[in-house]
């Protein structure tokens, strides 16, 4: 038991279920604004939390508008999680390639 707890402190793992629920609650508020999310990935490394998520916005939004929404989402996630490192990736919701999130290399269009 002691060795497992010691090793857990050295190994990265995903965030605990209660933190994932907090993330989902934040994202649910933004879904009501027409924003979609996928490819949510979390990691706990020591005392530091990391969150990565793809943010799908209408393709006719300006870069500024999409960026402003992404900044709001990142700030709220950091507030809820206590200074986590949050990374978002903006994608147009209409683009079928936006739905491919499992592969590191995307096929050429």
Predicted features along the sequence, with ranges:
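Alpha-helical transmembrane segments and adjacent TM-loop junctions that form the membrane-embedded core
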Residues: 1-109
């Amino acid at each position: 038991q002691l060795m497992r707890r010691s090793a857990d402190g050295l190994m990265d793992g995903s965030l605990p279920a209660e933190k994932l629920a907090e993330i989902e609650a934040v994202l649910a508020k933004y879904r009501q604004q027409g924003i979609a999310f996928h490819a949510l990935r979390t990691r706990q490394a020591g005392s530091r939390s990391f969150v990565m998520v793809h943010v799908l916005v209408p393709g006719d939004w300006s870069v500024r508008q999409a960026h402003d929404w992404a900044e709001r989402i990142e700030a709220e996630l950091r507030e809820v999680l206590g200074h986590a490192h949050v990374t978002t990736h903006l994608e147009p919701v209409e683009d079928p390639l936006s739905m491919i999130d499992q592969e590191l290399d995307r096929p050429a269009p």
